[in-house]
Amino acid sequence: MVNKPSLAKRIGYHESGHAIMAYLLHHPIEEIKVFVNKYSHYGYIITDPNLDGRPVSRCIKEGALISCAGNAAVYLLTGRKYWWRSSGDYVDVVGALSWLYGCKDEITAYIEFLWIQAKNLLSEPENWCAVEYLAGCIEGAQQEPGYWDEGEYYVHYDYEDTLQMDGFEVERIISREIEKYFSHEEGLSN
């Protein structure tokens, strides 16, 4: 069954999919930004991976996995597959492709493989709970009065763990909360 969540919910899950995958791959998250106006929306995350000593092949795979994770999270939420060849999420497709070189059919097959791998990683219960938690924070920020009015608004999680929205600042402890969440889960399993 296909679920049709609100745009705010899809945005939240999409960006949190990227962010949690980055966290799982040990790429520190510097910021998560969601930009919305009356006609369009987009979001992005910026990570600061410490790639020293990592093999190039691992860096390539991790970068492409993070790019695939946004659509994978939305799929897990909605049950709808966003095909890479026709996805409206063009930037993520380009992001994943930018890490890869080779013939078109091989790249398409590899991206499909990474998409499945991202979906499987995010669907693990503790990871999915973290996606839901962060998505709720992002979605909640979009519910602020005026957020969907005409004009340009954005949600911005920066390294200082502050949420800024159209001039308002609300404290949110995002990366710390994610880490606290995973520490709590590890404590429960011990």
PLM feature spans:
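Soluble catalytic regions of large protease machineries
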Residues: 2-190
